[in-house]
Amino acid sequence: MHIARAARTTLARLGAVALASALLAACGTGSAGGGRSSGKVTVSIDLFGTFGFKEAGLYGEYEKLHPDITIRQTDTEQEQNYWKSLQTRLAGGGGLADIQGVEIGRITSVAQLQSDKFEDLNEYGAAGLKKNFTASKWGAATAKNGAVVGLGTDNGPEAMCYRTDLLRKAGLPTDRDVLAKRWSTWQGYIDLGRQYKKNAPGKSAWIDSVRSIYTNVAGQSKERYYNASGKLIWDTSPAVKQAWDLSVDAAHAGLSGSLDQWSPSWNQAFAAGSFATLPCPAWMLGYIKGQAGKSGDGKWDVATLPGQAGNWGGSYLAIPRMSRHKKEAYELIKWLTAPEQQTKLFRKVGNFPSSVPAIEKVADTKDPYFSNAPIGRIFGSAAEQAPVQILGVNDQDVQEQIAKALFEVERKGTSSDTAWSNARKGVQNAIG
């Protein structure tokens, strides 16, 4: 996740970058040889956010099937911190895991600029798995020379998660179908937020952060930061402009809790009931469960997202050239991304499959935690209708700078024009 953005059900350790590097330097890298070591093999996997493998019991299941394999996972909560650490380790050639996670906003950069630092999975037979994945998921991880640098774990079709208890106390409807009609457009969603604010229980906000609005609105368009020719167009993109304006509107209306996503205060806000709605890709369901805990069971629900269908996040598993256990690593990622495991992952955690056979299997899935919401139908419909986004090498960098600028609007009251100027400067500094 994305994501996977940041992309999920995690109590991931803050500051885990340094810990991960230390552990992986000891057990995850070394010679480029890919052969099996004698005796029991420890396969290291380094991720960000929550991929859900551990939470869904998949590691334990794999270890039972392969008693000579032990899986050791390290993770970093914030993807941008993870990515910076990964780039440092790739440049230095040390501290890399046998398997590294890659967010969808980074996969084009890996495929186009860093494919020489990762194994071509075709060499291990990955070409035979192509039929399992959606065309866009497979294509994004394919380099110009045909090398496949990663296997997809999930997609991020979007919906709206909301607290039924808070909406009820504010005198608003709680039925998911009624709400879907009331917020069929983003303007309708903001207008409903204004109504919520008048009778908001406690000090609760309508939404956690306007970053949530921006990311999900932008995720509903094919072109965001790059056009089909690979040209960077973010500052003239209609999709970015629409997402920016709606986010600023929500900030000025005082609808945001001004929470920094993925921060400790954001995590605590789930359990505290500090906000009523959260635009949520499928992988966010597991994150909500992890942070809201038992106290949130049955209070959350899921409805169709305002506007049109969109996608936020989704991830890949890749094998660095410096992996010590390449064959074992490939067998593990092949198994983790297989239709059977992607089906289990969605049913247990909420990560929506990027596997075509798995998508067909989860259509009838409901989630008791989210008021028995038909998540298979809601996210399945979004996945089917969402545009295939054009990905660029610096998608995630651009998005982070825009998010920082919007945070100034909701936290400091910075004007839209000034914040936009700051975003442009930030992007220029980030990518040159």
Task: Indicate where each model-derived feature is located.
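Short helix-initiation/N-cap motifs at beta->coil->alpha
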Residues: 75-88, 104, 182-188, 258-272
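Glycine-centered hinge/linker elements that transmit conformational signals in sensory
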Residues: 190-194, 229-260
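Short, solvent-exposed loop/beta-turn-alpha elements that line the ligand-binding surface or hinge
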Residues: 122-133, 177-182, 223-242, 290-295, ...
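C-terminal capping/gating helix-and-loop segments adjacent to ligand/active sites or protein-protein/ligand interfaces
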Residues: 371-426
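Extracytoplasmic/periplasmic substrate-recognition and gating elements
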Residues: 64, 252-253, 291-352
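Conserved N-terminal structural module of periplasmic/extracytoplasmic solute-binding proteins
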Residues: 2-109, 130, 324-328, 340-344, ...
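Hinge/lid segment of periplasmic solute-binding proteins
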Residues: 103-159, 187, 297-301, 366
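Periplasmic solute-binding protein
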Residues: 109-114, 138-177, 209-229, 311-319, ...
